[in-house]
Regions:
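ER/Golgi luminal nucleotide-sugar-dependent glycosyltransferases, focusing on the catalytic module
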Residues: 1-172
Length: 172
């Protein structure tokens, strides 16, 4: 299962993502940040799922099946740590071992991007990294998209338009 996390008011981002995906997916749209959506999946999804943010544009999608075929947890990238940007394949069995905090603001979401994902990885033990080259330090540049300056992370499979990369304090 593919899960796309979004927030009301980000329909342009979601449309770009969905039109490039061309696959069935579950869209979760609320104000709970990434961990709120992952927590929803923990409670309602009983099989591994691939979590993506709405700011991803897919160039191809066959690689998604290849990663699911590994039958294990797979982090999309490891920058700034495993499951950077929270994206990757999560196993509900592992999720049931890890408490998921309620995130109140963007600063907390960024903090837990390292703290919580490290806890998940510790329980999962053997986590693959799909695209270690997707790193802020290897960004292809910056681009204004839908009124927001983004750091552009890109490889042959996808483009991620990253809104926060340490350029300013995260304020909601």
């Amino acid at each position: 299962m593919i899960v796309i996390g979004t927030t009301p008011g980000r329909e342009n981002w979601l449309n770009d993502c969905l039109s490039s995906l061309n696959r069935p997916c579950l869209v979760l749209s609320d104000f709970s940040y990434e961990l709120g959506k992952i927590n929803w999946c923990k409670k309602h999804v009983n099989k591994p799922f691939f979590f993506f943010q709405d700011s991803v544009v897919f160039k191809s999608t066959d690689w998604i099946d290849e990663l699911f075929d590994r039958k294990k947890s797979v982090a999309l990238t490891n920058d700034p740590s495993f499951y950077g940007m929270y994206m990757g394949i999560y196993d509900p069995i592992i999720l049931n071992m890890v408490e998921i905090p309620k995130v109140e603001n963007k600063a907390e979401a960024i903090k837990y991007e390292i703290e919580w994902t490290n806890k998940y990885v510790n329980y999962a033990i053997d986590v693959d990294i799909a695209f270690p080259e997707l790193r802020d330090s290897r960004a292809s540049g910056k681009e204004v998209r839908h009124g927001r300056e983004c750091l552009v992370l890109e490889n042959e499979y996808l483009i991620k338009y990253k809104g926060n990369w340490g350029q300013k304090p995260a304020i909601d």
